[in-house]
């Protein structure tokens, strides 16, 4: 199990086998052509409960909107944190 915390304070855990997934690599490869596909990464990493928690973590308190910038930053932090550990 890989556990960590993003710069914004979101605590996560990912089962290691989820990172050794060819289909995840395919989605990550497509990000170069279409950065908005980052949304497709989440189901490969997290279950529904953790996805919901990440969205709530990035929900703007005033507007109620889940910020794309916050979600993107947290997802990138998760990959950077994992890369640093390997």
Language-model features and meaning:
Residues 7-11, 15-86:
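Short, surface-exposed, charged amphipathic helix/loop patches that serve as local interaction elements
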Residues 1-7:
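Short acidic, Pro/Gly- and aromatic-enriched capping/linker segments at domain boundaries
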């Amino acid at each position: 199990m890989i556990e960590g915390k993003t710069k914004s304070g979101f605590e996560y855990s990912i089962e290691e086998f989820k990172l050794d997934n060819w289909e995840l690599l395919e989605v990550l490869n497509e990000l170069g052509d279409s950065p908005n596909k980052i949304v497709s990464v989440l189901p490969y990493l997290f279950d529904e409960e953790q996805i919901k928690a990440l969205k709530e973590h990035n929900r703007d308190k005033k507007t109620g909107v889940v910020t794309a910038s916050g979600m993107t930053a947290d997802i990138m932090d998760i990959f950077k944190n994992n890369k640093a550990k390997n």
